Amino acid sequence: MKQKNRKYDQYTHHFLSIMYKLFKENPEIFKIKKLRGIHGICDYENDEIQIDYRKYLIPTIIHEVMHYYYPDWSETKILIEERKIINYLSVRQIKHIIKRFANIL
């Protein structure tokens, strides 16, 4: 059985804490929409994170929250970090993200 990397465990936990804080303190910024050609967008001007519900929901939420918190990161860096988190999440953590996100809609 593959052992978990403690560094990624701490990193994932830290990011989830940031994301849950955003869910709790600013739930109104999340909008569910049909978007054309994209899965989601972090709209800084209108302080919105738009998510297309027809696409990959969990990775898109993580990706757009990263854009929200790290606006100076390149798209490439966001994609790399998103993949690290997605690949490291447990089933329990995925369920928790879904529950918390559903509660803000």
Residue ranges and their predicted role:
Residues E64:
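Walker B catalytic acidic pair
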Residues M1-L22:
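Glycine-rich short-loop/terminal segments
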Residues L16-I58, Y68-P71, T76-N87:
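Active-site scaffold of zinc-dependent metalloenzymes
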Residues I38-I41, F101-L105:
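Short, functionally important secondary-structure microenvironments
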Residues L89-I104:
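Short, positively charged interaction helices/loops
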Residues Y11-I18, K77, Q93-H96:
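Exposed alpha-helical structural elements
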Residues I61:
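A conserved beta-strand element that flanks and buttresses the S-adenosyl-L-methionine
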